[in-house]
Amino acid sequence: MGSMERLRQLVDILNEYSYQYYVLDEPVVSDKEYDQLYDELVLLEKELNTVLEDSPTIRVGGDVLKNFKAHNHLAPLWSLDKCKTPEELISWDLRVRRLLEGSGVPIEYVMEYKFDGLTLNLTYNNGQLVQAATRGNGTTGEGILEQVKTIKTIPLTIPHKGRIEVQGEGLMGLSVLAAYNKTALEPLKNPRNAAAGALRNLDPKVTAKRKLSAFCYNVGFYEGIDFNTHMEILAFLKANKFPVSNYTKKFHTIHQVIEEIETIGEQVKSLDFLTDGLVIKVNHMEARRLLGYTQKFPRWAMAFKFEAEEMTTELKDVIWQVGRTGKLTPAAVLEPIDIGGVTVSRATLNNWEDIQRKKVKIGCRVWIRRSNDVIPEIMGSIEETLEGAMDIEKPQHCPACHSEVVERGAHIFCPNSLSCKPQLVSRIVHYASRDAMDIVGFSEKTAEQLFEELNLRDLADLYEIKYEDLIKLPRFGDKKARNLLEAIENSKNCKLDSFVYALGIPNVGRKTATDLAKHYKSFQAIQEAEFQELITLPDVGDIVAQSIIDFFEDEEIKKSVNRLINEGIRPLFKEVEQQENIFLGKTVVVTGTLEKYGRKEIKELLEKLGAKVTGSVSKNTDFLLAGEAAGSKLEKAMEIIASGVETSLRIISEAEFEAML
């Protein structure tokens, strides 16, 4: 795999993991695995001197859900840089001292717990709690005022009358969770998800039943008061009756910080709430101002992450699961065990080689490592328990369709792409998805019904479904049947890039499909593409190019694609005739909420005008289109313009944008 291709792959993987963690509250990988991929990305960006516009290294978190009204923070809620070793803390301290050299500002550190709950941003005006919001993407969160009002430790009124934003963490105590689960019809699995789920529930009564608590630790925006140090902020919070942790310590050297970290382990284990580390902050505000920020982190703070917790349990079984590409992945079934307030019963084993390397057997005891509130990993087996344990059988046949499997490198695949249910159902769902053929109303449940009841075995079979077939299916009334048939019919007239993406070519994502369409301009040309030309395209390396060629040379795929074309699929590339306009060839960034356009709509419109739409502001940006509640991008644009650096950057409103069209 080429370096640029790996860069693109890492960005896509990390963004998906971030979406699962921050938006859905359903983390799918361990913090350790995420950190390893993130660190690899950072090194690769330095090596290539390239940062992609959607790289997680310049982002602050995830997207906002649509269930709640968006709220724009008065001040950004930053992510924190992190480290795991004393050596890394010392390196950070050296950077801080180098940047502050000659400033005369004293260097002191304050250390606090890093709470493992849901971040809250509380807005007070004239002494009243007027808004509470989740962190969201750092500049825009979700308004959850009514839910937060149910947390009895958060004051509804405070003595201070100026406008302020107080940052904190919503938590569910371990003892509260245990008491709740004794009477709950559906026990909650862990405190973090319990708190997050309660605060993001549309019914505040549900939130109230969880009996949440909170700790506040910062004032991000303030009027009518000023602070010289972080300790003054904490004193202000206490004076205004905010819940503040009783653990806050000030240190004069980083070595004092490290000594404290080395002795705090037992104290942390006795807490009634989860914490996944410590936060070390520069105490003096003037020092923070001088240190400033990177694109993602404040230079004046560092999160020290605790070592992952490890325990042992019995491996009860291994279930092999089949994905869209036919790859078989082993899932470990464990004797349920509580690790840090989380009941762990499943873990993912990567592949057959992983099973062999870790020497695990069914019935043996295995080491489980859990880093924070994430899916755990099996580290290995306890050798003394292997005797009498049962070997895990290497699958010779697909667990779903019983076809003989094949091995490709470290992975095992089911080659029966035509009638293996998990593969076909996943492939049909992908084909019908919004970014692909956009068949409205199509779901995984629908795909399973069509597979089971109508014997759907090929993508082209979708276009041969009759009304009489659908109306017989459970949960299919007249309206639903007609709507689905209409959506399937409408999908025949599709964009070339959407069709290419819908086919599910291995290693070809949405962007690569778009690049292929723009370059070749016809489906036939893509089918006949040659290796040497393919690798000249953006982000297409040897592996992606070979994947495309292999895909279209497969005889079964040829038959399937020909059937789709014969069914009336007309994938067209529309060359946009770009008339001379002010945005042609310009770089544009969009921020905030627009009144007349969604984010996808405005991006498509700008691209039709010949503009390049990017996600970050720099001196090379030509236009920043700023909607309502624009956040950090607007601030950065204003800073660039005010700095006097040579730039053509111009900030425009939605009304100005429309006047320029």
UniProtKB/Swiss-Prot annotation:
Chain positions recorded as Zn(2+) binding sites: C398, C401, C414, C420
Annotated active site: K114 (n6-amp-lysine intermediate)
Xref: InterPro entries: BRCT_dom, BRCT_dom_sf, DisA/LigA_HHH, DNA_ligase, DNAligase_adenylation, DNAligase_N, Hlx-hairpin-Hlx_DNA-bd_motif, NA-bd_OB-fold
Required cofactor names: Mg(2+); Mn(2+)
Reaction catalyzed: NAD(+) + (deoxyribonucleotide)n-3'-hydroxyl + 5'-phospho-(deoxyribonucleotide)m = (deoxyribonucleotide)n+m + AMP + beta-nicotinamide D-nucleotide
Binding site for NAD(+): D31, K32, E33, Y34, D35, S79, L80, E112, R135, E169, K281, K305
One annotated Gene Ontology cellular component of this protein: cytosol
GO biological process: DNA repair; DNA replication
Keywords: DNA damage, DNA repair, DNA replication, Ligase, Magnesium, Manganese, Metal-binding, NAD, Zinc
Enzyme Commission number: 6.5.1.2
Ranges of residues in domain BRCT: 578-661
Keyword Zinc included in the entry's annotation: yes
Gene3D superfamilies attached to this UniProt entry: 5' to 3' exonuclease, C-terminal subdomain, BRCT domain, DNA ligase/mRNA capping enzyme, Helix hairpin bin, Nucleic acid-binding proteins
Entry GO MF terms: DNA binding; DNA ligase (NAD+) activity; metal ion binding
Function: DNA ligase that catalyzes the formation of phosphodiester linkages between 5'-phosphoryl and 3'-hydroxyl groups in double-stranded DNA using NAD as a coenzyme and as the energy source for the reaction. It is essential for DNA replication and repair of damaged DNA.
Record-stated family: Belongs to the NAD-dependent DNA ligase family. LigA subfamily.
Name used for this protein in its record: DNA ligase
Protein species of origin: Alkaliphilus oremlandii (strain OhILAs) (Clostridium oremlandii (strain OhILAs))
Lineage of producing organism: Bacteria, Bacillati, Bacillota, Clostridia, Peptostreptococcales
